[in-house]
Structure formats: structure tokens, C-alpha cells
């Protein structure tokens, strides 16, 4: 069974083609980082226009690389929520066109759920239920994954997502956009002394027992105040402390989620998982707490991509899920498609 996945929810235009849910035949990604860099963040109008300009060429390239015809496709999965409305509409229209010409079944899928499906592409055992940790530019949450395409929220962010916090703090430090790689690089240059005290606060220290919640806006404010009061603090020290404080909250929330649900298997996904320091910390944490942890081995799978959309589509298609061309896109989060 050959399937296509179309991803245009935010600032990556991507099309992936896979066989039987996990064999990658081709994957094309156009990143818009350079387009948004001058603005220090994503501009929705620029994003949707770039998708429109690139998607046809990307389709041709991925089809040619996969060496298939449109008639070979069993389904076309497309991200329909959540995301930027204009961007989502570009991918949706491409899926509709393929359906109208070749009668290929359409599967609108949830972007959040597809991030976890990428682990199936890497051969991760998929025995459910498992905990899903999603850390990206727009999401910081923990879920119970009942199966591919069905999940329950355990804990969410109360304000900024972790990826967003990286970008905002990078802006305060005059580091390039996107902030994640540059903050990690600066942090790696700093070596704290054994008795050194943190210069940034412990996040959500008074969170009620058993509650799983993220909050990163206060960390950005703390960095701003620190820069105003202590000019002599280096960027490297701030970046190291920023990561240390943020990742500490991630670990504490995972520990709470495991205790709350009794589930000791964790799938971690999303763009922030490209951070090597975070991956290593989570691996150490999992080992100490007897938790099975799985993260994407390829950094390209941490970012938004069409392969993960196609993989989720495979599982949903086998269950008989599909929609007509009149499906709608939704910028808000939809956890379950029925």
C-alpha cells in the first residue's frame, strides 16, 4: 500500500510518500526559515504564499523520486488541523485536486497526532497505551496515546510553548531565528562550576500535586529582567541556565505523568526534540526512573514533514477512515477524528 502525506500547517512545505506505513520512498521539505528570519518569527501571509509557490514543484520531485504514478496511491493524507488557516488551505487544496482527478481517498489528519506516527517510520514498537510528549514551536503537552489517531490530553502549556520560548529568548539575546539551535550552541560553550547556583527560577515550583502543566512565559521574563540588572552575565551562561530550567520542568512533568497514569513507555516528538541536550537528559531521566523512552533518531523527523502525515494516514486508512472533498481545515486543535 502506497500513501502520500501533505504537510503545510506552518512554515514547512513537505510531501512524503511511503509504502505500508513505514518504508520511505521519498520525502521533500521546503523550509521557510530564511523567509521569516528578518521578522524574528512566522508571518502567516508569507507562509501561505510560500506554500503556494513551492508545493507543485515539490509534488513533482517527490513523485519522480518515488518512481510512482498517481494511480499507484492508495490514499492521500493531509494535515487539516491545527495550524495557520491560509497554510492549511494550500495543502488541503492539493489533496482535493488529486482526489478529483484520480479519485484517491482523502484523509484529513491532526498535525499533533502525526508527530507521534513518525516513530513508526523508525521501527519503534507500537504497543499501546503509551505517553506522548510533544514539544514544538506551538505545542508543549503530554498525552495518553490509545492508538494512532486517538489520544487523551494529560497536561498542556498554560502560555508559551517551549519552542516559542526558545525563539523569544534568542531574540532578547540578539541570536538568529530560529532560536533553538543557537541557544543550544551557546549553552554548550558554558561549563558551570560544581557549586554554581541557578540564575533563573525553578518553573511552576508550587504546582499542585499530581497536576501536569507547562509554562515558559515566566522564563522569558526572567531572562529579560536578568539582562536589565546584570549586564556582565554572558550569553553562554544565560543559555545554559535557560535550557536547564526549561528541561527540568519537562522532566518533572514526565515524572508526574508516569505517576498519574501508571504508563512507563514514552514517545517524545516535535521540533524541540532536535535539541541533543534535551534528548540526552531525557535518556538519563528514563534510565533512572525505569521508563522506556523513544525519540526520533533522524533530526529531519523532529520537524514538520509529510512522511509522518502519510504514516498516520496509513493507520487511519486501514480502519476505514476517509473524507470527501468538502472537508474543512481548522486552525484550532482537534485531538480525535471520528
UniProtKB/Swiss-Prot annotation:
It comes from the Bacteria. Substrate binds at residues 134-138, 167, 180, 275. It catalyses: L-threonylcarbamoyladenylate + adenosine(37) in tRNA = N(6)-L-threonylcarbamoyladenosine(37) in tRNA + AMP + H(+). It is found in: Cytoplasm. GO terms for cellular component: cytoplasm. Pfam families: TsaD. GO terms for biological process: tRNA threonylcarbamoyladenosine modification. Fe cation binds at residues 111, 115, 304. The keyword Iron applies. One of its GO terms (molecular function) is N(6)-L-threonylcarbamoyladenine synthase activity. Its cofactor is Fe(2+). Its EC number is 2.3.1.234. Binds 1 Fe(2+) ion per subunit. InterPro entries: ATPase_NBD (IPR043129), Gcp-like_dom (IPR000905), KAE1/TsaD (IPR017861), TsaD (IPR022450). Keywords: Acyltransferase, Cytoplasm, Iron, Metal-binding, Transferase, tRNA processing. Belongs to the KAE1 / TsaD family. Required for the formation of a threonylcarbamoyl group on adenosine at position 37 (t(6)A37) in tRNAs that read codons beginning with adenine. Is involved in the transfer of the threonylcarbamoyl moiety of threonylcarbamoyl-AMP (TC-AMP) to the N6 group of A37, together with TsaE and TsaB. TsaD likely plays a direct catalytic role in this reaction. This is tRNA N6-adenosine threonylcarbamoyltransferase. It comes from Leptospira borgpetersenii serovar Hardjo-bovis (strain JB197).
Amino acid at each position: 500500500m502506497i500513501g502520500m502525506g501533505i504537510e503545510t500547517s506552518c512554515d514547512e512545505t513537505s510531501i512524503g510518500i511511503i509504502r505500508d506505513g513505514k518504508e520511505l520512498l521519498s520525502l521533500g521539505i521546503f523550509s521557510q526559515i530564511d523567509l521569516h528570519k528578518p521578522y524574528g518569527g512566522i508571518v502567516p501571509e508569507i507562509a501561505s504564499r510560500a506554500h503556494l509557490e513551492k508545493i507543485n514543484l515539490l509534488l513533482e520531485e517527490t513523485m519522480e523520486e518515488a518512481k510512482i504514478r498517481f494511480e499507484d496511491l492508495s490514499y492521500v493524507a493531509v494535515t487539516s488541523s491545527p495550524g495557520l488557516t491560509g497554510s492549511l488551505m494550500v495543502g488541503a487544496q492539493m489533496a482535493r485536486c488529486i482526489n478529483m482527478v484520480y479519485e484517491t481517498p482523502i484523509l484529513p489528519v491532526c498535525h499533533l497526532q502525526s508527530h507521534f506516527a513518525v516513530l513508526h517510520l523508525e521501527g519503534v514498537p507500537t504497543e499501546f497505551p503509551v505517553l506522548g510528549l510533544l514539544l514544538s514551536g506551538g505545542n508543549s503537552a503530554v498525552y495518553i496515546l490509545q492508538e494512532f489517531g486517538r489520544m487523551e490530553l494529560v497536561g498542556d502549556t498554560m502560555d508559551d510553548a517551549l519552542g516559542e520560548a526558545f525563539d523569544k529568548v534568542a531574540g532578547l539575546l540578539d541570536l538568529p531565528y530560529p532560536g533553538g539551535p543557537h541557544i543550544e550552541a551557546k549553552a554548550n560553550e558554558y561549563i558551570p562550576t560544581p557549586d554554581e547556583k541557578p540564575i533563573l527560577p525553578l518553573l511552576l515550583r508550587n504546582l499542585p500535586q499530581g497536576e501536569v502543566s507547562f509554562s515558559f512565559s515566566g522564563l522569558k521574563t526572567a531572562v529579560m529582567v536578568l539582562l536589565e540588572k546584570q549586564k556582565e552575565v554572558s550569553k553562554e551562561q544565560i543559555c545554559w541556565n535557560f535550557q536547564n530550567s526549561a528541561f527540568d520542568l519537562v522532566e518533572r512533568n514526565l515524572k508526574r505523568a508516569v505517576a498519574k497514569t501508571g504508563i512507563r513507555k514514552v514517545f517524545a516528538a516535535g521540533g524541540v526534540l532536535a535539541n541533543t541536550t534535551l534528548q540526552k537528559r531525557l535518556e538519563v531521566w528514563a534510565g533512572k526512573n525505569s521508563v522506556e523512552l523513544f525519540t526520533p533518531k533522524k533530526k529531519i523527523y523532529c520537524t514538520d514533514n509529510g512522511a509522518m502525515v502519510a504514516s498516520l494516514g496509513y493507520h487511519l486508512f486501514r480502519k476505514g477512515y476517509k473524507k470527501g472533498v468538502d472537508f474543512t481545515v481548522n486552525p484550532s486543535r482537534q485531538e480525535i477524528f471520528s
